[in-house]
Amino acid sequence: MFYTTVGKIIKELNLECLTEISGIEERKIKDMNLNRPALQLMGFFEYFDEQRVQIIGISEMAYLKTMTPSQRRDAIERLFQRNIPCVIITSNQEPFEEFLEFSKKYGVPLLRTQEVTTRFMTNLSTFLTHELAPRITRHGTLVNVYGEGVLMLGESGVGKSETALELVKRGHILVADDAVEIRKVSEKTLVGEAPEIIRHLIEIRGIGILDVKNLFGVGCVKESERIDLVIQLETWKQGKEYERLGLHDQYIEILGIKVPTLVIPVRPGRNLAIIVEVAAMNNRQKKMGYNAAKALTERLQKQMSRGNGAE
């Protein structure tokens, strides 16, 4: 199971740590869902998921103010007794002393943000969705071409990196080369990025490692990109039938999501960069509802119908 840590969300979301607890930065978060513990402060813990980050907003704090000191103490202790990853107070509110006391007693990090509850929960949810999403690493190259995320797959040496370099020269954006980390961030969306150690780098045989960001500028690189199209490059195989009309869409399944795919044969003289550009534009056009192959078929059928009618 994938996880992130309290230390990462402190750094990413600029949180203030209100209590000093050993090992706080390594404390694991395994659930991308969040919880506002209104019912739990009332004493109802049925169906309570202890793995979720607990958010104390203005409403929860206002409810605690209506309690007597002994009721408030019991309510806060019941929450901290659970094996929760952390408690975050929003809107820069001052915590009750009981929050600080039981945070230290039970070793549960107590954090605070200046952001309002709704905005903070949106930002934290987005971060956790990315960090905890199912993922795999594929050997390939990911580029942004006319706004379409194109993942190029194929055997080593088939020309993925060279094609990506030519695309960058033509004004497109490199996301990842050689290794692409693919995350399933929703039931319909895959996002790819480069491992941090090789981010913005590209390998060209005969030259070596190139830093695309330094060579071409920050506008030519991107940290992550949605995967809209998969292009599988392969050496041209004599006698193999390749798609010539494009009537029947093909798909590849990655992490349970079907992504449109094309098989592009590679041989000397073919300009792969232009082919990838056109493939990206054509894929975008299909998503907008137009398919050139189907339009041609319809025109042919109409012409044949007119011809049969004339007879």
UniProtKB/Swiss-Prot annotation:
Residues annotated as binding ATP: G154, E155, S156, G157, V158, G159, K160, S161
Enzyme class: transferase
GO terms of biological process kind: regulation of carbohydrate metabolic process
Keyword annotations: ATP-binding, Carbohydrate metabolism, Kinase, Magnesium, Metal-binding, Multifunctional enzyme, Nucleotide-binding, Serine/threonine-protein kinase, Transferase
UniProt EC number: 2.7.11.-, 2.7.4.-
A Pfam family: Hpr_kinase_C
Binding sites annotated in the UniProt record for Mg(2+): S161, E203
Location of the region described as Important for the catalytic mechanism of both phosphorylation and dephosphorylation in the Swiss-Prot/TrEMBL record: 202-211
Gene3D superfamilies in the record: HprK N-terminal domain-like, P-loop containing nucleotide triphosphate hydrolases
Domain notes: The Walker A ATP-binding motif also binds Pi and PPi.
Family: Belongs to the HPrK/P family.
Protein known as: HPr kinase/phosphorylase
Organism: Caldicellulosiruptor bescii (strain ATCC BAA-1888 / DSM 6725 / KCTC 15123 / Z-1320) (Anaerocellum thermophilum)
Source taxonomy: Bacteria, Bacillati, Bacillota, Bacillota incertae sedis, Caldicellulosiruptorales
